[in-house]
């Protein structure tokens, strides 16, 4: 990879970051002001906080009034996946507004101290991996909302054909707000993953050179002074990599912790959506096979869309967290594969220090200090959801057969 493409990658990441900060400010989710060239780039702003407060109050009043009106008219049906999904996203959006205003000062300090672009300059990002990550992020932030908008349009054409399509955008907006911080969390982890991949490539290059220098033919070819000089240079580079790894671990933890509440709420929403989605599909089939009612194909299709989105959201997040953990374990494996038999003492010290750092921290994703988010945890959660679904289905079938 040449320096031109590496510079283009950094510019791309910087451009996407600026767009993200701009959208967060416009929608009232960032009550801080950005000032380029200052030591504290992000500073708490009372004007931005007032703007965010107006957003929060207006959003709560508009959508709270809608829920209250539907409750009075008896239109709330929590067995419907789309209705439950909408209510949950409205709730999460309000919580996001309030939580972001409470921690706005903390967020400003964290963002100001993160050496984000300095760290990017240290590493060359792989083109293929970066583009795949950006595509996945765009699928999550753009393709999923568009798919849900299509489902809303189909549902409105079926239930309220006289209403304007603007109403579907009104229903989609809470979903965008509720997922905004979650998408920021996802994007931050994508960047961390790419930096860890780049760091591992640097370690692999060192592994090849260190092991090559200690082969028998190479020991005879180079003088002891040359090897000592080369090992000292490699040790300096390894210390720099360890320093960058520590920065990644410390600052990403400080950034992800205040954002993790939104992620946990989003996971809860998706798990409830999966439960109701599967139950709605079963309910439609049971009505047809047992009660003899006509099968609601369009309603099942709409429920299937929301069910698929929830499954895809959890799958993407789980795989990303798993890739982060695998990348961290890969760093430890590379360090352990280094042959230190004829290495300089300075280099041995650098390797042992870096190994200790990696094995102790392990870069575990622990939202709010809770369980480590990985494939095992998600599989256990899915097992619990499946068990709960079986209980619901069994109870419904028992009631249906009693009525006959």
Curated annotation (Swiss-Prot):
Disulphide-bonded residues: none
Tissue expression summary: In larvae, is expressed in neurons of the terminal external chemosensory organ.
One GO BP: monoatomic ion transmembrane transport
Keyword Transmembrane helix tagged: yes
Compartment list: Cell membrane
Topology term for the membrane: Multi-pass membrane protein
UniProt keyword annotations, A-Z: Cell membrane, Membrane, Receptor, Transducer, Transmembrane, Transmembrane helix
Gene name for this UniProt entry: Gr94a
GO cellular component: axon; dendrite; membrane; neuronal cell body; plasma membrane
Function of the molecule: Probable gustatory receptor which mediates acceptance or avoidance behavior, depending on its substrates.
Cytoplasmic topology ranges: 1-11, 65-133, 193-260, 318-376
Protein family membership: Belongs to the insect chemoreceptor superfamily. Gustatory receptor (GR) family. Gr22e subfamily.
Topological region Extracellular: 33-43, 155-171, 282-296, 398-404
Matches recorded under InterPro entries: 7TM_chemorcpt
Keyword Membrane recorded: yes
GO molecular function, one term: ligand-gated monoatomic ion channel activity
Protein name: Putative gustatory receptor 94a
Pfam families: 7tm_7
Segments passing through the bilayer: 12-32, 44-64, 134-154, 172-192, 261-281, 297-317, 377-397
Domain of life: Eukaryota
């Amino acid at each position: 990879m040449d320096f031109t493409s590496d510079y283009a990658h950094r510019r791309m990441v910087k451009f996407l970051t600026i767009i993200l900060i701009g959208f967060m400010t416009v929608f009232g989710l960032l009550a801080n002001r950005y000032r380029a060239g200052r030591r504290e780039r992000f500073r708490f702003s009372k004007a931005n906080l007032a703007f965010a407060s107006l957003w929060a109050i207006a959003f709560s009043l508009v959508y709270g009034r809608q829920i209250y009106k539907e409750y009075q008219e008896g239109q709330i049906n929590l067995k419907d996946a789309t209705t439950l999904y909408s209510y949950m996203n409205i709730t999460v959006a309000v919580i996001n507004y309030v939580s972001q205003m409470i921690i706005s000062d903390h967020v400003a300090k964290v963002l100001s101290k993160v050496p984000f672009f300095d760290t990017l300059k240290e590493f060359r990002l792989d083109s293929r991996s970066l583009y795949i990550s950006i595509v996945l992020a765009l699928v999550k932030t753009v393709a999923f909302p568009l798919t849900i908008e299509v489902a809303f349009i189909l549902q409105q054409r079926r239930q309220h054909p006289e209403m304007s399509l603007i109403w579907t955008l009104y229903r989609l907006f809470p979903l965008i707000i509720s997922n905004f911080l979650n998408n920021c969390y996802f994007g931050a982890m994508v960047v961390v993953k790419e930096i860890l991949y780049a760091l591992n490539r640097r370690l692999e290059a060192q592994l090849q050179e260190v092991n090559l220098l200690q082969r028998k033919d190479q020991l005879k070819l180079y003088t002891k002074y040359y090897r000592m000089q080369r090992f000292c240079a490699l040790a300096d580079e390894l210390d720099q990599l360890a320093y960058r790894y520590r920065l990644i671990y410390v600052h990403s933890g400080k950034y992800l912790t205040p954002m993790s509440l939104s992620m946990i709420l989003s996971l809860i929403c998706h798990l409830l959506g999966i439960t109701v989605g599967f139950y709605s599909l079963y309910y439609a089939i049971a009505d047809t096979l047992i009660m003899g009612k006509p099968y609601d194909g369009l309603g099942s299709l709409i429920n299937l869309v929301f069910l698929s989105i929830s499954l895809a959201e959890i799958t993407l997040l789980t795989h990303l967290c798993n890739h982060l953990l695998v990348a961290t374990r890969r760093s430890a494996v590379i360090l352990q594969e280094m042959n230190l038999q004829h290495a300089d003492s300075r280099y041995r010290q650098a390797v042992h220090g870096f190994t200790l750092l990696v094995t102790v921290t392990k870069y575990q994703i622990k939202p709010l200090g809770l369980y480590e988010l990985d494939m095992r945890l998600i599989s256990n959660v899915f097992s619990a959801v499946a068990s709960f679904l079986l209980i619901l289905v069994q109870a419904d079938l028992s009631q249906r057969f009693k009525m006959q």
